[in-house]
Curated annotation (Swiss-Prot):
Keyword line: Toxin-antitoxin system
InterPro entries: VapB_antitoxin
Known role: Antitoxin component of a type II toxin-antitoxin (TA) system. Upon expression in E.coli and M.smegmatis neutralizes the effect of cognate toxin VapC11.
Domain of life of the organism encoding this protein: Bacteria
Gene: vapB11
Any one Pfam family match given in the protein's UniProt record, by short name: VapB_antitoxin
GO MF annotations in UniProt: toxin sequestering activity
Name of the molecule in the record: Antitoxin VapB11
Regulation: induction: Induced during infection of mouse macrophages.
BP terms from Gene Ontology: detoxification; positive regulation of translation; response to host
Signal peptide: none
Length: 72
């Protein structure tokens, strides 16, 4: 879905927010923090390992009901 391409862009970002993202996710650069934020916002393709990790989470529901066009 996404082509791997990079371009250099200068942006002004909130240093405190960048530092918090770096702290929470163990990142070492602001570039990595911005990349993570963009990928999470757009929605990265889910890895096989992530999907396998969801197995057995215990979700219970009615998929047919979720798929219907009926309002609650």
């Amino acid at each position: 879905m996404y082509r791997w391409c990079m371009s250099r862009t200068n942006i002004d970002i909130d240093d405190e927010l960048a530092a918090e993202v770096m702290r929470r996710f163990g990142l070492t650069t602001k570039r990595a923090a911005v990349d993570l934020a963009l990928r999470r916002l757009v929605g990265s393709p889910l890895s096989r390992e992530f999907l396998l990790g969801l197995e057995g989470v215990g979700w219970e529901g009615d998929l047919d009901d979720l798929r219907s066009d009926r309002p609650d």
